[in-house]
UniProtKB/Swiss-Prot annotation:
Disulfide bonds: none annotated. Residues 908-917, 1211-1229 have a biased composition (Basic residues). Its main location: cytoplasm. It comes from Caenorhabditis elegans. PROSITE patterns: PH_DOMAIN, RHOGAP. Disruption phenotype: RNAi-mediated knockdown of isoform a results in mis-localization of par-6 in embryos. Keywords: Cell junction, Cytoplasm, GTPase activation. Residues 599-726 form the PH domain. GO terms for cellular component: adherens junction; cell junction; cytoplasm; plasma membrane. This is GTPase-activating protein pac-1.
Length: 1605
């Protein structure tokens, strides 16, 4: 014994032990390498040196954080229930009689207080220095046929310096099994340890160094013997009753003879102690096992002892020879007296023998690997079978109860490497089976390890089950990640096991907790273990040749929570589950931290191009099966569908050829027998949020979501995936085709057809629920409809009934696996359950929760395009009916039938809210959309019609660029609306327009058959509704027809003065438009030109149409008020030009040399081209030009208008108007008389009269412009040429026409300033009372004639023409001729005042009385005429095209009407346009005269009896008092009503209303008492009217905006 320890000390010094982290079983290889002599190391090949370096790096990267532990003598005793089993270093002592052996160290060590790590010489500088590394020792005593036991002890491996931690993370090594040699691969990951390492009494390294120190110092203390190096992970449960320590050593194969002392100790303690080798449960064991196989020993019988002496070497060789000669000696020891047991630690001894210990370690152990046998391949299947037969019943019984979780001695054939557990460490080198191991890894190698136990099977089972319940707990996530790692490509090409033969592992179902999926076990053929019998079926597995990989390499592995499942997944080599044998269900424990299997990337692969069905970029996510709710963790993947596999790659293929495609790192989804359908829960009611998601549920119970870009792409992927899935069903059915009868094959095909029908019906139902109405969807529905009819004929009635029940949602009636031709495999049953339970139950239930409150409303669809419910049920076996009742509007409800199944809306459905996009409507959020357009069904997917670019709008054909909506609207209008008065001018009903818009959005243009308008929606026959829809479409375009880029060029081109240059420029710009814009514009302009050809009927001339379409077609995208104000005239003028010259503008064959068409008469007059404005219009007035007018307006008011619009908020403009009104009122203290010279001018003064030509030119220039409010009146006014306008008339009449022109005060610079003050010379004629009376009478006649014409219309003008006096007739005719175009009353449609109002006015006139007036004072009197500059400001200077000017400019326009004798100079309250154009007072109540006090019947009475009245003084001024007549309080005030209030006795009430006094501000002079008495007398019935003096027009500005009423 002393000699043994002396040699041990020498070996330790020679090895120069340097600190390093050696864990688990990997140190065995290092120990033997370190113990070799120097000359052996020098003779080692370069390959071995490279392997040493690789293993050294591996061990360094996998270093745990170990450190020294408390010094010797301070052993910490833990209770069994308080110890943590995992991550422990196993040291057991065989000599239980020795106290030091009983207190052997158990556990691995981690010092949490060590600040740094020591390396190199720091660890060996002193003999008392504790090593900073971990070593694994196992004290064992192995009997050798009664000759005693050998004890092998060795030092650990040497690594001079550790690798740097900062370069790479602590890697995880994974194994991949193919036909080449094992090679562990390093993956940067697993950056922290799985869990803290357990603390024990003393470090095994410290314990061993203490032994060395005591031996070297001559200590006489007892030495613990029986130490042997365990080079591999130790099996946790061995058969202690077998008497053999089943510890395999794949490297250290030689034995060192030991004294019989240890043998005796072991014999004495054999009945008391049942030992069990323990292992650390770290995820690195596979890495060290890989390292061990890469570094096998070349010498089987010479090991460490060759350096120390030859005695033990000879003994070892003798042992090996003995083992070869008698293989049955070590396999059949049943005598307990001859058995040797492994000593257990004091901690473990507190357990119930070794049963509880072994059960506590259940399903976590790793058997010893005899990799030398695997490498050499010396054993054969036949040898294993023969050895198994020799073992007998007792051996089989012990094998069954060994329970090594697939790593035991069961002589079964499974797909995986064989982990042999041998009783000795010797290995035969002659190629025969070892005497101690009857199993060897060869072609289809069979493992048989002889280990026995004497305890009863029942007690073992019960103890094991109890222990399994105690040890089940959740694994940390880091541990799951480490043990679930997949494999790399380099291992695929380099690994080999058992001479290119695959082997498997037997798995006992009684020792694990949960069922292991058959996809993990592959073609594992589990053996039926029978207690009491040694018979077991052994079957050789199919060998893999070439580079063929196993199923476990291509398919993702479910996460294993312990090493047994991981090794099963790593080493099974069968790919297909052919169902040739009965599978034995395996149970596995699931971890709560497990991840989806396909999350782990597989190495690259090469695919055949002919097998690739489809590939593109998709968004993918995998969710846990059965999880509810949406997740947005989408990942971009390159999807490649090849046969029955879907490859999801991170990057697109880097290298492709004509025949192959090389994929990089990817995940693989098996779509064989998968369920493919639309993900209904991702459907959205908003088009902008619509997602096209495909759901794939595979047979291994994983769920994948794939998002495509478009609907057509989604449908094509569904079709291809379903065909691939059905091909998988057909392939699975053909496996047992020889065993199936003709009837069975018929049933299988029928059910396959039914399954295909089920897929197709689900797709149709999803399409119907999504309300997709595009052409692609219609074609798909038709094709699927035809396909289902064909499949319906092929399916028999029995299976048809089954499919009907399934599609109707009856989950209780489910077919068995016999429906698929009698296949009873697990995959088939899983597929059947997934198809029936998952998609029919879960998805339909989820779809019912997605319904919106409007989902059950009637769906307005064309019955001719959608099949009825009865037809749908007949063709799709009621699946479409069921889905339509669940996911979308029910067709049965629409047809008046009661649905068979209704979906109840859960509470979540009550909280359903309309999205923002749905509230705004599909037309881009128009403000006029009704509530019907705001609500969209949750299952609907409306296609927007409005708010879409021209290029994206649906068209009739590929060559046609005109949108379908434009063609439809134009077709309807040209068919039914050419003779409609006011077409495009009169708007349609807003609700009807929105209804048409929604109909087109939901159903598209397929339901609009213009050839059968009678059968369409009645709203399509309303031309006003259709015209409004067309204008709305143009207004909602994101980019107008004349694009933003060319818009400023069009504006500049329109302002070119020369006619031919302007047309050429406009045509050149038109040809620069995009093709869709150009074609659509040409289509519209040609249509508008056709409208103008019927203008005599529809009253829509070119300029009227330009007013309607100019702001919609010619506009910028960012409509701002300043641009609209300044460019309004240009916009309308451009459209007018295009309509006039459409043939020349859109002639694509024309060139620049073509002659320009002559200028159209209505095209206007350019400033540089005087004359030619219109037929019969004289020339000479340059200010009448439209462009000149616009330029003047733009230059004067553009900046001011923009500034005012910016200040439009907060009533700033209103305050400005009030301030201006107060400022102007202070200037109105002077008496301002009327500007009507014929009425107020004295005889001594005559106003300068312009020429008739000038007057006519101005009148024709301004009075004949566009009038949006009254189309017919404007046409009549332009067509009527009065002879009094062109022929010379009286000077007074000419002055009246000129001065009272409504556009006079609004024309910039067209007339001189008429604000003047001239003295009125007194003459002796005024002293004559008769002259006074004549002047007064003449004025009254002119005034009353105008009122009579206004009230009575044409009849009043005819009556006025019959006046007896020639002068009166001439004056009345002049006044009537001037105002005739403003007071047309030929049509009742343009009569503003009703008969009731006229009657009220007549009654008021009859009640009115005139008072006597005093004579006018003689002398000079200053008469001030109304200044034109007060009215000619920015508010009234707007182009005659401006129909919708800015709000600030039109809020409070100044009033030009102030008195009764100026009826025609008023602006229009009812119009928001302060343009200089003439207004038709009959269309607006704002231009009512301020005094309607005299009826036409009083005219003759006044003129005939005028001489009898008392003469009135010239300066006499009185106030007119009228009584307030009864009015309808609900009617809005007109000027007549307002003036009545002002002139009555309710002055305070009028002021309370905020209405300034607009009646004649007549101040009384001092009146004598006689006159006062005379005034108080009863009024005369024919009293003369007073002299009215006009007030300042600026004083009449309303105080607030409410007075616009």
């Amino acid at each position: 014994m002393e000699e043994h320890h002396r040699r041990l000390h020498v070996k330790a010094e020679r090895a120069s032990v340097i600190g390093g982290d050696i864990v688990d079983g990997a140190f065995g290889s290092w120990a033997l390498r370190a113990a070799r002599s120097e000359h052996q190391l020098k003779q080692q090949s370069n390959e071995d040196l490279a392997q040493n370096a690789r293993i050294s790096a591996l061990l360094g990267e996998m270093r745990p954080r170990m450190s020294a532990m408390p010094p010797n003598g301070h052993q910490q005793q833990y209770q069994p229930q308080l110890r943590r089993k995992a991550n422990t270093t196993n040291i057991v002592d065989v000599s239980s009689q020795v106290p030091s052996a009983r207190n052997a160290i158990y556990g691995s060590w981690q010092d949490r207080h060590r600040p740094t790590r020591l390396y190199g010489s720091q660890l060996v500088s002193s003999s008392s220095t504790l090593p900073k590394y971990d070593q694994l020792y196992c004290n064992t005593a192995s009997p050798l046929t009664g000759n005693g036991s050998t004890n092998t002890i060795a030092t650990t491996g040497i690594r001079r310096e550790p690798p740097e931690y900062g370069n790479v993370g602590r890697s995880v090594s994974t194994w991949q099994v193919t036909n080449s040699e094992h090679r562990p691969s390093l993956q940067a990951g697993w950056l922290k340890s799985s869990r803290p390492l357990a603390r024990g009494a003393l470090s095994p390294a410290a314990y061993f160094r203490d032994l060395e120190n005591r031996h070297g110092s001559g200590a006489s203390s007892p030495i613990v013997g029986g130490l042997s190096v365990v080079a591999v992970p130790i099996t946790q449960r061995h058969a202690p009753t077998a008497g053999l320590a089943p510890i395999s050593d794949d490297i250290s194969t030689s034995k060192v003879s030991l004294d019989t002392e240890n043998q005796q100790l072991n014999n004495e303690d054999s009945d008391k102690i049942s030992g069990s080798a323990l292992s650390r449960n770290t995820p690195r064991q596979a890495s060290f096992m890989a390292a061990m196989q890469r570094h096998p020993l070349k010498e089987s019988s010479t090991s460490i002892e060759s350096n120390g002496g030859g005695t033990n070497t000879e003994e070892d060789q003798t042992v090996s020879a003995t083992s070869k000669e008698d293989p049955s000696e070590d396999t059949g020891h049943d005598d307990p007296e001859e058995t040797q047991e492994i000593s257990e630690t004091p901690i473990r001894r507190s357990r119930n023998r070794n049963a509880s210990l072994r059960n506590r370690q259940s399903s976590r152990s790793l058997g010893g690997l005899d990799f030398e046998k695997l490498r050499m391949g010396t054993a054969r299947v036949g040898d294993s079978n023969e050895a198994t037969a020799e073992n007998g019943t007792s051996s089989s019984s012990s094998r069954k109860n060994s329970r090594d979780d697939g790593l035991t001695s069961s002589p079964t054939t499974v797909a995986g490497p064989v982990f042999t557990t041998s009783s000795t460490s010797s290995i035969s080198t002659s190629g025969e089976a070892s005497s101690t191991a009857v199993a060897a890894a060869a072609a289809g190698s069979v493992a048989a390890t002889t280990s026995r136990q004497t305890s009863s099977n029942s007690s073992v089972d019960s103890n094991h089950n109890e222990a399994m319940k105690m040890i089940r707990r959740a694994r940390p996530k880091s541990y799951v990640l480490a043990t679930s790692a997949s494999m790399n490509e380099d291992v695929l090409s380099s690994s080999i096991i058992a001479n290119e033969q695959s082997s498997s592992i037997s798995h006992d179902t009684t020792t694990s907790g949960r069922e292991l999926p058959s996809s993990l076990m592959g073609s594992t053929i589990s053996m039926e273990m029978r207690s009491g019998g040694a018979s077991s079926a052994t079957t050789t597995t199919t060998s893999n040749s070439g580079q063929q990989t196993s199923r476990s390499l291509n398919a993702p592995h479910p996460p294993a929570t312990h090493r047994l499942q991981r090794f099963i997944a790593l080493f099974n080599s069968s790919k297909t589950s052919d169902g040739s044998g009965e599978h034995k269900k395996s149970r596995m424990k699931r971890s709560r931290t497990s991840l989806p299997a396909s999350r782990f990337a597989l190495p690259g692969t090469i695919l055949q191009r002919d097998g690739v069905a489809r590939q593109t970029w998709v968004k993918h996510q995998e969710i846990a099966l059965g999880k509810s709710g949406k997740r947005n963790n989408w990942e971009d993947r390159w999807a490649v569908l090849c046969r029955r596999s879907l490859y999801l790659c991170v990057e697109s293929p880097a290298y492709t050829t004509e025949k192959t495609i090389e994929l990089g790192s990817h995940t693989r989804v098996d779509v064989c027998n998968a369920i493919v359908d639309i993900a209904y829960d991702w459907l959205s009611s908003s088009f902008s949020k619509q997602r096209h998601v495909v759901r794939i549920v595979t047979q291994n119970r994983s769920e994948h979501l794939i998002e495509l870009n478009t609907e057509s792409e989604m449908l094509s992927w569904i079709s291809v995936l379903q065909s691939s899935s059905e091909d998988g069903i057909a392939t699975g059915s053909s496996v047992d085709e020889n065993e199936l009868s003709t009837t069975g094959r018929h049933n299988n095909n029928a059910v396959s057809n039914s399954s295909a029908l089920l897929h197709n019906s689900q797709s149709i139902a999803s399409l119907a629920s999504s309300s997709c109405s595009t052409a692609t969807t219609s074609e798909f529905l038709n094709s699927q409809h035809t396909l289902q009819q064909q499949q319906q004929q092929q399916t028999n009635q029995k299976h048809q009934q089954t499919v009907n029940e399934l599609s109707a949602g009856i989950v209780s009636h489910l077919p068995t696996s016999k429906s698929f031709g009698g296949l009873s495999t697990t995959a088939s049953s899983t597929t059947e359950n997934a198809k029936n339970r998952l998609i029919m139950h879960r998805y339909i239930a989820k779809n019912s929760q997605l319904q919106s409150p409007t989902a059950n409303k009637k769906m307005e669809t064309d019955p001719s395009t959608v099949p009825s419910s009865s037809q749908t049920m007949a063709t799709t076996s009621s699946s479409f009916h069921h889905h339509s009742s669940q996911a979308g509007p029910s067709r049965d409800i629409e047809n008046g039938e009661a649905p068979t199944a209704t979906a109840t809306t859960p509470k979540s459905g009550r909280k359903w809210k309309k999205s923002k996009a749905a509230k705004q409507g599909s037309g881009g959020g128009s403000s006029g959309s009704s509530s019907g357009s705001q609500q969209q069904g949750a299952a609907g997917a409306p296609q927007p019609v409005l708010g879409v670019r021209i290029a994206d709008c649906p068209t009739g054909s590929c060559e046609d660029h005109v949108p379908m909506i434009v063609q439809a609207c134009v077709c309807v209008i040209e068919t039914y609306g050419m003779d409609t008065v006011g077409i495009y001018r009169i708007p349609g009903n807003t609700a009807a327009v929105n209804a048409l818009k929604e109909s087109l959005s939901n159903r598209g243009f397929d339901s609009v058959d213009l050839s059968k308008v009678e059968s369409l929606d009645p709203r399509w026959r309303d031309v006003n509704v259709v015209s409004s829809l067309l204008k709305m479409f143009l207004r909602k375009l994101p980019e107008p027809l004349l694009t933003d880029k060319l818009y400023p060029f069009f504006i500049d081109a329109n302002r070119i003065s020369t006619h031919h240059n302007r047309l050429h420029k406009l045509r050149n710009l038109l040809r620069k438009l995009p093709r869709p814009h150009y074609d659509t514009l040409r289509f519209l302009i040609v249509h508008l030109s056709e409208i103008t050809k019927h203008s005599d009927v529809n009253k829509m001339e070119c300029r009227n149409l330009a007013l309607m379409f100019g702001p919609s077609i010619v506009r910028p995208s960012d409509d701002n008020m300043a641009t609209m104000v300044t460019h309004m005239s240009d916009q309308c003028k451009i459209i007018e030009t295009l309509i006039h010259y459409n043939l020349w503008m859109f002639d694509e064959s024309s060139t620049t040399e073509d002659a320009v068409p002559e200028q159209h008469p209505a095209d206007g007059q350019n400033p540089l081209e005087p004359g030619g404005y219109g037929v019969g219009v004289p020339t000479g007035v340059s200010a009448a030009s439209f462009n000149d007018m616009h330029n003047l307006i733009r230059k004067a008011n553009e900046d001011q208008a923009a500034a005012m619009m910016n200040e439009g908020k907060g009533q700033k403009i209103k305050n400005m108007l009030r301030r201006n009104s107060r400022r102007d009122k202070s200037k109105s203290k002077l008496k301002i008389e009327s500007t009507a010279p014929a009425a107020v001018n004295p005889r001594g003064w005559t106003q300068p009269t312009p020429s008739n030509t000038s007057a006519a030119s101005v009148e024709s220039a301004f009075c004949g412009n566009y009038q949006e409010r009254d189309i017919d009146a404007e046409i009549e006014s332009r067509q009527t040429v009065s002879p009094q306008m062109t022929s010379g008339s009286a000077d007074g009449a000419s002055s009246t026409r000129l001065d009272q022109s409504p556009s006079l005060e609004s024309s910039l610079g067209s007339l001189p300033d008429t604000s003047r003050t001239e003295p009125i010379l007194g003459s002796s004629g005024y002293d004559d009372d008769e002259a006074k009376e004549a002047a007064r009478r003449k004025r009254q006649e002119e005034m009353y004639s105008a009122r009579r014409i206004f009230i009575a219309g044409a009849a009043g003008a005819a009556a006025a023409a019959t006046t007896t006096a020639d002068a009166e007739k001439a004056a009345i005719d002049a006044l009537a001729n001037h105002s005739q175009h403003l007071h047309l009353a030929s049509s009742p449609a343009f009569e503003v005042l009703s008969e009731e109002t006229r009657e009220k006015i007549r009654r008021m006139q009859k009640k009115q009385s005139w008072h006597d007036t005093k004579e006018l004072r003689s002398g000079e009197l200053l008469k001030t005429y109304s200044p034109t500059k007060d009215l000619t400001d920015a508010l009234s200077c707007t182009s005659d095209y401006s129909t919708t000017s800015s709000a600030p400019l039109s809020t409070n326009p100044p009033l030009a009407v102030a008195c009764a004798d100026q009826p025609n100079s008023s602006s229009d309250y009812a119009s928001s346009d302060p343009s200089p154009c003439a207004r038709n007072p009959s269309t607006s109540p704002a231009s009512r005269p301020s005094n309607l006090a005299i009826s036409p019947a009083q005219l003759h009475a006044t003129s005939s009896s005028g001489q009898s009245h008392q003469p009135m003084s010239r300066s006499q001024k009185i106030r007119l008092r009228t009584k307030l007549g009864s009015r309808d309080p609900a009617r809005r005030h007109t000027l007549s009503d307002v003036d009545t209030l002002k002139e009555g006795r309710l002055d305070k009430l009028a002021r309370w209303f905020g209405i300034r006094k607009s009646s004649p501000d007549v101040s009384r002079d001092e009146v004598s008492d006689d006159e006062k008495n005379h005034q108080e007398a009863p009024p005369l019935p024919a009293a003369a009217p007073p002299v009215i003096v006009r007030t300042s027009p600026n004083e009449l500005t309303p105080v607030s905006g409410d007075e616009l009423l």
